[in-house]
Amino acid sequence: MTHPYTYIDPNAKLAPNVKIDPFTVIHGDVQIGEGTWIGSNVTIMDGTRIGKNCRIFPGAVLGAIPQDLKFAGERTTAVIGDNTTIREFVTINRGTEDRGKTQVGSNCLIMAYSHIAHDCMIGNNCIMSNSVQVAGHVVMGDWTVIGGTSAVHQFVHIGQHTFIAGGSLVSKDVPPYIKAVRNPLSYGGVNSVGLKRRGFSLQQINHILDIYRIIYNKGFNTSQAIDFIEEELTASDERDEIVTFIRESGRGIIKRYSKGANDEE
């Protein structure tokens, strides 16, 4: 169902039961899945792929070309999974030749005025609060929650089940299962509340706590801590996830908080 004041390029591919409100513009190389609602004054540009049962609120712009001077017009996409909600004035740029696409997973909530830049890979069940700004090439694991007005530096990796406090500047990688708080952004403990809500057992949570006590509280450098964890702690999916994430970190992980003269709480 579309409103007569909506413009839809004849080459766009819309599944059944897509509803589009007035004054929205949909370009030609666009695919929209069944049951999705598009609000008024939305612009959906070439290369956008939207899954089933999504909700796109007024003013959003999806699939615009990257804000990257190296972009040379290559054919790329912006892909959004199923059951994802994109609130007012969100912008999601399509990819560059680096990854070829920007991707937002299924069951995500991207709140108003947030920006997701080129080549980002956002997992499933993620929440970005109002005005979160994510630079290019960021990788964000499933079940990440980021508080409002935070900014994420390009190429940062954020592990799954992570909570990042509002107003944060994320310039280092954030390992999985933790809370990241304060300025400068620092380890704030294990995200126990979030893990309990998602069905993690007390044994699993305590195992994760043991791992991060070694990383942040035992006086080891990062390499020593990882070696100790592999040698001394029982193997588990959580242990392997944390160890692999830290070993592959390109920007280094956030540190334990250490109050300095210029720090702000």
Which residues fall in each region the model found?
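Structural signal for interior beta-strand "rungs" in well-ordered beta-sheet cores
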Residues: T2-S186
